[in-house]
Amino acid sequence: MEERFKKQVYEVAKLIPHGRVTTYGAIAKALGYPNHSRHVGKAMGGCPADVPAHRVISSGGMLAVSGFQERLEAEGLVIKNCRVKDFKKLFWDPIKELND
């Protein structure tokens, strides 16, 4: 995977506000690669500590890593059965946010 792509993924992930979440697919789409959500997931799997990987979840609102539940709950999110409650309300759309 290209280092440039990883850096772009990390830059977008760092913009996700505290208490909000986005998806692998939304980041991929925002970067112009709408079919590369798995590549975003792979990049996030090895991200630096300053990247809030816990705020990037699957398109159905499911946590990809169960260990992220505690970090999201600390930000005020409610997690039930590894799923973010009120996912649609808490969803941060990078395309909308970056174009405003």
Q: Which sequence ranges carry the predicted segments?
A:
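Nucleic acid-binding interface residues in structured DNA/RNA-binding domains
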Residues: 1-100
